[in-house]
A protein has these predicted regions:
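RNase H-like (RuvC/DEDD) metal-dependent nuclease/polynucleotide-processing core
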Residues: 2-251
Length: 251
C-alpha cells in the first residue's frame, strides 16, 4: 500500500506580531481526503512542523516565503553558503534591523535564479517581502536546520528524516499551470470572479475542498486561504540548478 505524503500548504506572514494567527495552513492527509485548514502564528507553525517530525510520517511543508537571498547579495554580506547567510541574517535583532544593515552594504535588490526562472513576483529583499524573508529564515528555518530537518535544497537533514520544508509560490504555480495568476486578490466583483475561476481548477487537479472552506476561500479578499489551498497540491517535478544550493529554490 502506498504511503501518502502529507502535504501542508502554508500562506506565511512576517508581521511584527509574530503572525498573529494570520498564517493559514492547508493540509492533505490523502488524495481523497478533504483538505483541513487551520490558523497559526509563526511559533505555532514551528510547533506544527516539529510535531510532524515527531510522528515519523512523511510530511512536505510548502511555505510561501523566500528561503534565501540572491548570490550577489550574499557576496556583499561576505558570507558563504546558505547556512552562512542564514546565520548572518539571524545575527540581527529583527527584520527591520537586518534590512537597515543590508542597505549599508548595498541598495540593489537582485532576483535569485528561481525568481527569474519560476517568475516569482519580487526579490527576497524587496520592501514588500523582506519581513517574510527574515522571519521565515531566522525564526523557522534556522532552528529546523539545527534540529536536522531537511530543507530542500539547501539542508540535507538528518538520516531518515521524513519531514521536508521548502519554499513555494502560488503565483509561480498558477503560471506554470496556465491558470489565472493576477487579479484574484482584492475587493470587488472581478477579483471574486477570478477566485471563483481558480478554485474549481484546483479541485479538478485533485484537491478535495469541503464546501464551507471553498466558500471562505472565495470570500477571502486577501486571497490568503486560496494561496494555502493551492500549495496543498503536489509540486511539479523540477531540477534545481547549482545556484539553488545557496539561494534556495521554489517548488
Amino acid at each position: 500500500m502506498e504511503r501518502w505524503l502529507i502535504i501542508h500548504g502554508v500562506d506565511f506572514s512576517g508581521a511584527d506580531s509574530g503572525g498573529a494567527h494570520k498564517i493559514r495552513i492547508a493540509t492533505r492527509h490523502g488524495r481523497q481526503t478533504p483538505v483541513q485548514v487551520e490558523r497559526a502564528d509563526r511559533k505555532g507553525l514551528l510547533e506544527r512542523i516539529r510535531a510532524g517530525v515527531a510522528d515519523g510520517r512523511p510530511h512536505l511543508w510548502r511555505i510561501d516565503a523566500p528561503m534565501g537571498l540572491a548570490l550577489p547579495t550574499i557576496e556583499e554580506a561576505g558570507v558563504k553558503g546558505w547556512r552562512g547567510c542564514a546565520e548572518w541574517m539571524a545575527g540581527f535583532a529583527g527584520a527591520r534591523d537586518w534590512r537597515s544593515g543590508l542597505r549599508t552594504l548595498t541598495r540593489q535588490e537582485p532576483r535569485r535564479t528561481c525568481d527569474h526562472d519560476l517568475r516569482t513576483p519580487m526579490p527576497p529583499t524587496n520592501l514588500r517581502v523582506f519581513k517574510q524573508t527574515w522571519t521565515f529564515v531566522c525564526e523557522i528555518l534556522v532552528p529546523l536546520a539545527q534540529e536536522g530537518v531537511r530543507i530542500e535544497p539547501v539542508v540535507a537533514g538528518a538520516p531518515g528524516m521524513q519531514t521536508v520544508v521548502c519554499e513555494s509560490c502560488p503565483a509561480s504555480d498558477l503560471q506554470r499551470r496556465g491558470w489565472p495568476h493576477k487579479g484574484y486578490k482584492g475587493k470587488g466583483e472581478r477579483p471574486r470572479e477570478v477566485r471563483e475561476e481558480i478554485l474549481p481548477r484546483a479541485v479538478r487537479a485533485g484537491l478535495v475542498v469541503p464546501e464551507s472552506i471553498g466558500e471562505q476561500a472565495i470570500a477571502d479578499e486577501e486571497g490568503d486561504l486560496l494561496d494555502a489551498l493551492l500549495l496543498a497540491l503536489e509540486p511539479a517535478p523540477t531540477v534545481a540548478p547549482k545556484e539553488a544550493l545557496v539561494e534556495g529554490w521554489v517548488y
